[in-house]
Regions:
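C-terminal and inter-domain tail/linker signature
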Residues: 1-131
Length: 131
């Protein structure tokens, strides 16, 4: 079923790009005109965003806790954890371990992720980073 194929694609993206620290997954798994939260980033722009996250949290882990699919959309509720080792959101490295959740809705088109809407509590992240 297409829904299962789409869910597998989303799982693969987070596994390869985040857990395996391979931002080149953006080149393989995202559309050339990839859009994130309304901003056209393309593959290169999203790869930069992944690299920024991985530099700030080199041991970043992503666990998809819930994944649902309908038509061309996949929703994933995720748990993230990592150690703050470089600048992130204007906060210099603290060495603090943080954990947060996010929810993403991703659109799959022609076997690639073409769009994502991501919601995470950046206030909670900053609170953990700044104490």
């Amino acid at each position: 079923m297409q829904r299962d194929t789409n869910k597998d694609l989303v799982r693969r993206f987070y596994r390869e790009a985040i857990n395996e620290r391979d931002s080149s997954a953006c080149e393989r798994l995202l559309s050339e005109d990839f859009v994130h939260n309304g901003e056209t980033r393309g593959r290169a722009g999203q790869r930069q965003a992944v690299d920024y996250f991985l530099a700030a949290f080199p041991d970043l882990r992503n666990e998809i806790e819930l994944i649902l699919a309908e038509d061309d959309l996949v929703a994933a509720h995720q748990r993230w954890s990592g150690t703050h080792s470089d600048e992130f959101l204007g906060v210099e490295a603290t060495g603090r371990r943080i954990e947060f959740t996010s929810t993403a809705v991703l659109r799959v088109r022609d076997g690639l992720i073409s769009q994502a809407w991501d919601e995470m509590d950046t206030g909670a992240i900053l609170k953990q980073l700044t104490g």
